[in-house]
Amino acid sequence: MKFNTVALTLATAGSLVTAQHHHQHRHHQHKREDVVESSATVVQYELDGKPISLKQVCAGLADNTLKFANNDHPTGICDNLSSAAAPASTPEVTSAFAPAQFIELSSVVTSATPTSASSSETVQTPAASSSSASSSSTATGLDADFPDGELDCSTFPSEYGAIPLDYLKLGGWSGIQYVSYAGNFINDIVTAVAGDTCKDGAMCSYACPPGYQKSQWPSTQGATGQSVGGIECRNGKLHLTNPSLSKKLCIPGVGGVHVQNTLGETVAVCRTDYPGTESETIPIGLGGNDLQPLTCPDGETYYKWQGKTTSAQYYVNPKGVTPEKGCQWGDGTQPIGNWAPVNLGVGLNKGKWLSIFQNSPTTSEKLDFNIKIKGDNLSGSCKYENGVFYSETGSSSSGCTVQVMSGDATFVFY
């Protein structure tokens, strides 16, 4: 997927300058899916080098106090803007997101004091529930260093923060990759199926509780761009693959992002196991009024694909689907697993970015509930309601994105 950033510069008596930055990144598809390339455009309006909202742009154009540099005025940008007060605009995603992807969240926003988003809603958050299928209350040893090279490969490291996923029938692992090396690359990867084990030559990936993510992946990755993740089984023992990042198996995200379910029924939210098998096997089970942290990786320090920043992607299943059913590979007969209707994107890269988007072109199925992003200070609005995505600039069939300017933000299911 190509992710293009367009900066439109305004001036009180200036000339038009349009700068376009191309941030290419691979579209990481799950196994058995064809690679699909798509593009998205992010628009950022700047005045004197600082971002301003679309509302401010349109007001300035209307009263002739602002104009675009070089008179290159984009058409129709103010057509769908509501006359009601709106928070500072975030870059709007204007074309379809591709499915099963890891978006390189990037922007041309320069450092500046965030504009107050007066209409952003403050989230009234209940205490985090412990009913999640992967709740941190069930994790032990999160702060313990992993004993490198000591545990047998037949031992799942649940005493070191990892959460066993017994329903996948992989000995608790979230995914297993049997790899073969050719010089500085891995030239052959065989993905384990139910009943397989973590054995010599395997990279064995694992789930962490909400708010945490795995810290281990080898520096040697797939020769054709495949991602590889987990700890390594070598000579019958489990070994760390990324000890320079952490000697703990699970590390926290940057924090400040949550997911809340107000539906009264279970909802399974599933993170893609990345780097690794790229299947949506990392579960969060939300009960009727649960609030759980949603892990947001730091783009500067977390996994990079060919040097490019990646984000976390979550699949949202229909209500009533359990993590055991929804957080694994589906066959397409039901809108669950990799066929779930909607994805959430979360990442930190020159700002914290949150997205809601259709799992397209895998499916056009609609979710049977709504989602909105609420926060202390958001750059705009983003919600999914009755199968349509809405931002402060109008509606879309593909998705919407906001930046968290300050404070916390929550994806609310309602």
Swiss-Prot record:
Traits of the deletion mutant: Leads to smaller colonies and swollen and vacuolated hyphae with double cell wall and leaky tips. Also leads to decreased conidiation.
Record's comment on post-translational modification: Highly glycosylated.
Up-regulation conditions: Expression was detected 4h after the initiation of spore germination and during mycelial growth.
Location of this chain's protein in the cell: Secreted, Cell wall; Secreted
Residue span of region Disordered: 115-141
Leader sequence residues: 1-19
UniProt cross-references to Pfam families, sorted A to Z: SUN
Thermal effects: Optimum temperature is 37 degrees Celsius.
Gene Ontology biological-process annotations: (1->3)-beta-D-glucan catabolic process; fungal-type cell wall organization; hyphal growth
Class in the EC hierarchy, top level: hydrolase
Compositionally biased region (Low complexity): 115-140
EC numbers for this chain: 3.2.1.-
GO CC annotation, single: fungal-type cell wall
InterPro entries: Beta-Glucosidase_SUN (IPR051526), SUN (IPR005556)
pH-dependence annotation: Optimum pH is 5.5.
GO terms, molecular function: carbohydrate binding; hydrolase activity, acting on glycosyl bonds
Protein keywords: Carbohydrate metabolism, Cell wall, Cell wall biogenesis/degradation, Glycoprotein, Glycosidase, Hydrolase, Polysaccharide degradation, Secreted, Signal
List of glycosylated residues: 80, 377
PANTHER family found in the cross-reference section: BETA-GLUCOSIDASE-LIKE PROTEIN NCA3, MITOCHONDRIAL-RELATED, SECRETED BETA-GLUCOSIDASE SIM1-RELATED
Function, in words: Cell surface beta-glucosidase involved in cell wall biosynthesis and septation, and thus required for normal growth and correct hyphal morphogenesis. Has hydrolytic activity on linear (1->3)-beta-D-glucans such as laminaribiose and other laminarioligosaccharides. Also has a minor transferase activity.
Protein name (Swiss-Prot/TrEMBL): Secreted beta-glucosidase sun1
Organism encoding this protein: Aspergillus fumigatus (strain ATCC MYA-4609 / CBS 101355 / FGSC A1100 / Af293) (Neosartorya fumigata)
Taxonomy of the source species: Eukaryota, Fungi, Dikarya, Ascomycota, Pezizomycotina
